[in-house]
Amino acid sequence: MLNEGKVLPVDISSEMKKCYIDYAMSVIVSRALPDVRDGLKPVHRRILYSMHELGLTPEKGYRKCARIVGDVLGKYHPHGDSSVYGALVRLAQDFNLRYTVVDGHGNFGSVDGDSAAAMRYTEAKMNKIALEMVRDIGKNTVDFIPNFDGEEKEPVVLPSRFPNLLVNGSAGIAVGMATNIPPHNLGEVIDGITMLIDNPEATILELMAQIKGPDFPTAGIIMGKSGIRAAYETGRGKITVRAKSEIEVEDNGKQKIIITEIPYQVNKARLVESIADLVKDKRIVGISDLRDESDRDGMRIVIEIKKDANSNIILNQLYKHTRLQDTFGINMLALVDNRPEVLNLKQILQHYIKFQEQVIRRRTEFDLEKASARAHILEGLKIALDHIDEVISLIRGSKTAQEAKLGLMDKFGLSEKQAQAILDLKLQRLTGLEREKIEDEYNELMKTIAELKSILADENKILAIIRDELNEIKAKYGDERKTAIERAENDIDIEDLIQEENVVITLTHAGYIKRINADTYTSQKRGGRGIQAMTTKEDDFVENIFITSTHNNILFFTNKGRMYKLKAYQIPEAGRAAKGTNVVNLLQLDPNEKIQAVISIKEFDEESFLVMCTKKGIIKKTVVGMYKNIRKSGLIAINLNDDDELVSVRITKGDDDIIIVTNKGLAIRFNEVDVRPLGRNALGVKGITLKEDDFVVGMEVPNQESDVLVVSENGFGKRTHVGEYKCQHRGGKGLITYKVSDKTGKLVGVRMVEDGDELMLINNLGIAIRINVSDISTTSRNAMGVTLMRNNGDEKVLALAKINKDDSEQLEDSEEVSEVHDAEENNSEE
């Protein structure tokens, strides 16, 4: 009072700090963050309590929203009417709340971002589940405080008989902090609470067996559980939510992508607009039409696809470039005793259980107090009825009611309340039937009092009541999960946008590489002339050719024993007759380094092995997983002697047989058990003993049903059943597999084949031919074979690859390998 009316100098820095802290705490505690107990912010709590006070229960009629907003403003929330109405609208939107607590009548907005109609037009009342939020509020279950002007009382928190914080979630931005809690399935959350009540030591992982993850009102698909687990364990995490889609195929073969569910809080109209913009800007091609066919029966966005486009590729592009796939950042921040805390899943459930214990205890105490008060009155009535004549005489002899009351209290030892109840007793209660009712009521009350006292004395009974009442709510309001949870995928990258299909990859002697669709080459009869596979320079020719899938890892092994990796789709696609791209633009090769072997694999595992064979007959086996981390600059796959180079690479299972074939027609078969696994940089061991001037042209891994097919440089070939090659010990000289002559020329390659397979041959002029293996007769090891490809003049067969066109599944899972030696070097060694 001494400083009233005076101007006091203060330090502006200190005053700003104080005022800002006061403002920040006001926003945090009184506006932006939900209470962990009822999951509500103050404005939502005041709206529900005001509607409860107005009697807007589900069985009653709707009331104008302007009336509700006015009541909230006038009694509890002296802020802007638009903010209160906006909060009321959100409580009624079934695309915002998993379980709406307000039943809105009129235009309350839409998932397209349409605003609600003005509050003077809309009406509302409480939803049935909202009654569970305020149930027992009149039984002193929660504390009340004065409102802003001290003329009313408002609850500090609602009893919230279901865990609203998790069930409906919450979002808000305070000062220096924000909360974003996703909604969940009511039944799952109640099951989680039940588990925690029964087993307080339950881990978060065990709780996740009941609470699978967020359950959004707009459904959608959550991709993976890692983000969910992180959020549940730490209170923070990020999940990926994807739209639900399906591809419809019409009778004419035309395809449509149908979107029926979108990620939570995504504006549908803006989503459709963003797709249209991508098509307009030609960032996505292949979409012929786009329309929104959503109606009162549900959401339906139709994306029509052009006939020559792939629906799956377009869908993945849409996931990448639009909010058909969105992220939801979880930050489970809530007020605990008016202090903001980041809570994990178990802590939220524990706080709710603790709060419900208080609610049940206070309700029980209220019921006990009320029952005890009634029992006290009944005890007085019983005394009066037992002495009815004396009571009547005393009352009749009293001059005033007060005198009668005091007389009853004095004569029968009654309390003031008991005496007043006797005076208020109607004469009809003096009948025998009424006296019996009073006796029965008293006996029932004594049982109730005993039960209430036993509840207060036993915490387990309180927990049992919480569990039973929650299960009743689950049975009444529970529903099926809307949001599906699917296996996690890696972040969408270019691979998701590439159609998986079989392709032919060719690599020339000069290092030109390209990718071509496998169906470009049509099958021809044995001995045909072939078609032009590619255009090569006069001094260049195709050296490597193999079949693979666009999504496979392509491992390139060089003559120096180094290896590199590319995805098949990273190899540029070109026309059949095009030259291709020089491999030095894709791989960091040394000047004297050239690709000598190529292998295609889907993934790097620890159960499979890479078996490598060199020109000098050295063999090495290494676990595939050891080559997982391949640098862009490559790494050493095998150490070589100065006069040796790498020839072949195959994938094995650890107990396969191996066949090595030489240029002069010799072959050896042995089991890879004879070759112990070695490290990446090891040299290897002897696989075959070579004659002078002989060298290895290929290595294969046979099975019992396959045939060994060898091809000579002059276009001759032969099939021999693998059974004719008996197993020997590693390091032997081998057996004759092909009698080479000037007519046939020496061998250039070997493949394991079966009926149904196809063979592709290519010569040094780039001419290719595709042959059915069944057209090649099976002969003995010593036979000369048949003509597979007619060559003119100096033409020489250089490369071969096996193709299994009819079995696409096998192609996708296969690990096809193709390799060819430097033809000029091979010829010089002959």
UniProtKB/Swiss-Prot annotation:
Tell me what reaction this enzyme catalyses. Answer: ATP-dependent breakage, passage and rejoining of double-stranded DNA
Q: Name one GO molecular function term.
A: DNA negative supercoiling activity
Going by the record, the broad EC class of this enzyme is isomerase
Positions of the Topo IIA-type catalytic domain: 33-497
UniProt superkingdom: Bacteria
Q: What is its main location?
A: cytoplasm
What do the Gene Ontology cellular component annotations say? Answer: chromosome; cytoplasm; DNA topoisomerase type II (double strand cut, ATP-hydrolyzing) complex
User: Annotated region Disordered: where?
Assistant: 805-830
* Motif, GyrA-box: chain positions: 524-530
**Which CDD domains does its entry note?**
TOP4c
Could you list this entry's UniProt keywords, alphabetically sorted.
Answer: ATP-binding, Cytoplasm, DNA-binding, Isomerase, Nucleotide-binding, Topoisomerase
Q: Which InterPro entries match?
A: GyrA, GyrA/parC_rep, Gyrase/topoIV_suA_C, Topo_IIA-like_dom_sf, Topo_IIA_A/C_ab, Topo_IIA_A_a_sf, Topo_IIA_dom_A, Type_II_DNA_Topoisomerases
The Gene Ontology biological process terms listed for this entry are: DNA topological change; DNA-templated DNA replication
| Active-site residues annotated for this sequence | 121 (o-(5'-phospho-dna)-tyrosine intermediate)
This entry's Enzyme Commission designation comes to 5.6.2.2
Where is this protein localized, as stated in its record? Answer: Cytoplasm
Its UniProt miscellaneous note says: Few gyrases are as efficient as E.coli at forming negative supercoils. Not all organisms have 2 type II topoisomerases; in organisms with a single type II topoisomerase this enzyme also has to decatenate newly replicated chromosomes.
Q: What does this protein do?
A: A type II topoisomerase that negatively supercoils closed circular double-stranded (ds) DNA in an ATP-dependent manner to modulate DNA topology and maintain chromosomes in an underwound state. Negative supercoiling favors strand separation, and DNA replication, transcription, recombination and repair, all of which involve strand separation. Also able to catalyze the interconversion of other topological isomers of dsDNA rings, including catenanes and knotted rings. Type II topoisomerases break and join 2 DNA strands simultaneously in an ATP-dependent manner.
Q: How does it assemble?
A: Heterotetramer, composed of two GyrA and two GyrB chains. In the heterotetramer, GyrA contains the active site tyrosine that forms a transient covalent intermediate with DNA, while GyrB binds cofactors and catalyzes ATP hydrolysis.
- Family classification: Belongs to the type II topoisomerase GyrA/ParC subunit family.
Q: Which NCBIfam families match?
A: gyrA, PRK05560.1, PRK05561.1
Q: Which HAMAP family match?
A: GyrA
**What is the protein name for this chain?**
DNA gyrase subunit A
- Which organism does this sequence originate in? Clostridium acetobutylicum (strain ATCC 824 / DSM 792 / JCM 1419 / IAM 19013 / LMG 5710 / NBRC 13948 / NRRL B-527 / VKM B-1787 / 2291 / W)
Its lineage reads:
Bacteria, Bacillati, Bacillota, Clostridia, Eubacteriales
